[in-house]
Amino acid sequence: HDKTAKDVPLEIELSLDEFPSPQQLWAKYKVFKGITEPENERITSQDYYFDGSGRRPRYYQQIAINRTIEAIAKGQNRILITMATGTGKTYVAFQIAYRLWKAGVKKRILFLADRNALIDQANRNDFKHFGDKKTVVKNRRVDKSYEVYLAIYQGLSGSEEEKNIYKQFTRGFFDLIIIFQILIIYLITPWT
């Protein structure tokens, strides 16, 4: 089945010597996905993070990660990913952040969540792989020498002006902001 072709039948029989090489298949795939610029190819071809444990993204996680990376490579700035409980949302967020960071297109990343438990879990598990490039924003103190920041919404702003530490970051300071579990925040807080 060739879903990339426009003027040929979807299904044709090929002999083994007619079958496209991996390079030809990759070229067709890139055209089909609109990955035509070298920069876009560099972003989309950046591999996942593998820690040697054998853990790999599940098929549905790969779909979410790859579609997000492809959308960003094409210039899309806002992306909503919806996943059910227990499907590995934090791992997906980490893989997206890692691939974009490693490709060099997103150098400063902010991961926002609504509660400390989510930040602690992300810091302890998936995001630990950023090592000394990562920090958790605590006690309303910011060190701008890091590349990856994990914070809770309430830790960046408050009802009093001096608690609004988000103002210490200039507009555009972050290249990528991951707002984790936004629906919960939207429904239960006055942040709307």
Predicted feature residues:
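ATP-dependent helicase/translocase motor core
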Residues: 1-108, 113, 117-133, 144-148, ...
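Short, flexible cytosolic linker that couples an ABC transmembrane/permease module to its adjacent nucleotide-binding
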Residues: 134-140
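Conserved N-terminal phosphate-binding loop of PLP-dependent enzymes in the Aspartate aminotransferase
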Residues: 177
